């Protein structure tokens, strides 16, 4: 299979590129710049290549799709996260919505029928329950979630009008080696391994579904590989939601002497924005339809992440 990965130098995109290349697929990575991991990948695998381009520039997107005519596109390119989207709302809409429109239009023009779009639990806004499935109402509040839900709806229009197959993986707080964003559990693991003190004033009661990168990649590729779908949206997550206080306790247990603490109350991002109510994502649909079976519950994922950080590869 020939797969074009937009935003393929990013955290999830690069992990997908490594996995697909290793199993023998032809992988084309499209991004602003080649990351060290993608440079190493293209040097190691003849079936992996890189093209520089801007997702918001129609000529760039059209050129790569027309040249390579992929069997499928995994659309990762985006401004990711609540904090980044609040820092640049218009850039977020331009990249996330405008970029996705460029991808969809190039698919229409050049005969590419299949796309897997990396979406997010932020499309839901505040959760109505501790565990939610894909039928939960979409009421996004921040530019990130708003833009990603807009992409899902835009894709539905292209599906109806042009017969494309557009599938959406709603991810949730993906973590593991390579995570670039200063967010838990990265900040906690980094501090623990470095022997630094990190006391958070609040957030101890906050629960969210943390998904280890290997499980995330497995779920996305299962969506990619399945020929016929009854649904266009899947949760790719762990299906559980430990509290931040519980995560702190696990890390302290795994790294003796770690000086970590999370006080009670809401979780705040690095810019001070309070996170809305979260919880776990019900992954029954992905289990049933895709055979998805995450291998990294939070304790195992944290242990793997700590080991990678100690080895200097995180």
Map each language-model feature to its residues:
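SDR active-site strand-loop-helix element
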Residues: 6, 30, 73-77, 115-121, ...
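N-terminal Rossmann/SDR dinucleotide-binding element
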Residues: 1-72
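C-terminal substrate-binding subdomain of Rossmann-fold SDR/epimerase-dehydratase oxidoreductases
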Residues: 192, 196, 200-314
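Conserved internal alpha-helix within the Rossmann fold of NAD(P)-dependent oxidoreductases
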Residues: 58, 99-100, 220
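Short alpha-helical oligomerization interface
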Residues: 82-99, 133-140
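Active-site helix of classical SDR
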Residues: 147-150
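NAD(P)-dependent short-chain dehydrogenase/reductase
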Residues: 9, 129-130, 153-208, 213-222, ...
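Conserved Rossmann-fold NAD(P)-dependent oxidoreductase catalytic core, especially the SDR/UDP-sugar
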Residues: 75, 101-143
């Amino acid at each position: 299979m020939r797969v074009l990965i937009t935003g393929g130098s990013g955290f999830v995109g690069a992990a997908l590129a490594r996995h697909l290349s290793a199993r023998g697929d032809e992988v084309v990575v499209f991004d602003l710049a080649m990351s060290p991991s993608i440079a190493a990948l293209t040097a190691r695998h003849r079936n992996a290549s890189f093209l520089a381009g801007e997702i918001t520039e129609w000529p760039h997107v059209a050129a790569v799709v027309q040249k390579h005519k992929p069997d499928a596109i995994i659309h990762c390119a985006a401004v990711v996260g609540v904090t980044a989207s609040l820092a640049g709302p218009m850039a977020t809409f331009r990249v996330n919505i405008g970029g996705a429109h460029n991808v969809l239009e190039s698919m229409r023009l050049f005969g590419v029928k299949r796309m897997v779009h990396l979406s997010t639990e932020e499309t839901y806004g505040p959760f109505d329950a501790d565990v939610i499935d894909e039928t939960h109402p979409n009421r996004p509040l921040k530019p990130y979630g708003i833009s990603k839900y807009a992409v899902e709806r835009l894709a539905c229009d292209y599906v109806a009008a042009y017969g494309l197959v557009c599938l959406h993986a709603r991810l949730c707080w993906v973590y593991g080696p390579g995570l670039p964003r200063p967010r838990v559990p990265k900040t906690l693991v980094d501090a623990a391994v470095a022997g630094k003190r990190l006391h958070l004033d609040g957030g101890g009661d906050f629960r969210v579904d943390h998904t280890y990168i290997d499980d995330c990649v497995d779920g996305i590729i299962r969506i990619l590989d399945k020929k016929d779908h009854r649904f266009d949206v899947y949760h790719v997550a762990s299906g559980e939601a430990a509290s931040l206080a519980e995560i702190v306790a696990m890390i302290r247990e795994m790294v003796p002497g770690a000086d970590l603490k999370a006080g009670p109350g809401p979780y705040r991002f690095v810019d001070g924005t309070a996170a809305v109510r979260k919880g776990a994502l019900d992954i029954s649909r992905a289990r049933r339809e895709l055979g998805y079976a995450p291998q990294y519950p939070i304790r195992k994922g944290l242990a793997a992440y700590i080991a990678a950080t100690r080895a200097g590869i995180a």
